[in-house]
């Protein structure tokens, strides 16, 4: 199960694709609870400093908790996601899916900093899942879904 916490840009999209994200969590990790928390630039900078000793904001941070009620948390800063989307010529919505799915894969044990084989596998899975979720979301015929509806 995924719980979306925080409001603002991106929360509607994440609610729209929540079931699909839950399928990815179930496939990669199992039947666990994951929180996706939307935070400000200041909040993510503080978390990045506290837990990674990086004195700058980032787009996503993932914490494996393995507690009874919450397996892990994915902190996302929509402002940084938006900056990255512009830098990579991506839409905000697709970039947001990239970072949330990236976080899910970290919770599943994938790492891209040290292991080349696992890193390649992680990014291949990330690309596959993003395309699946993006394609399904864009083809949703409801009035409230699709690019530009956020």
UniProtKB/Swiss-Prot annotation:
Cofactor(s) needed for function: Zn(2+)
Cofactor details (free text): Binds 1 zinc ion.
One GO cellular component term: cytoplasm
UniProt GO molecular function: metalloendopeptidase activity; RNA endonuclease activity; zinc ion binding
Entry EC number(s): 3.1.-.-
Keyword terms: Cytoplasm, Endonuclease, Hydrolase, Metal-binding, Nuclease, Ribosome biogenesis, rRNA processing, Zinc
Domain of life: Bacteria
Biological-process GO terms, alphabetical: rRNA processing
Location within or outside the cell: Cytoplasm
Stretch forming the signal peptide: none
Major enzyme class: hydrolase
Main location: cytoplasm
Binding site for Zn(2+): 102, 106, 112
NCBIfam families, A to Z: rRNA maturation RNase YbeY
Functional summary from the UniProt entry: Single strand-specific metallo-endoribonuclease involved in late-stage 70S ribosome quality control and in maturation of the 3' terminus of the 16S rRNA.
Family: Belongs to the endoribonuclease YbeY family.
Protein name: Endoribonuclease YbeY
Lineage of source species: Bacteria, Thermotogati, Thermotogota, Thermotogae, Thermotogales
Gene coding for it: ybeY
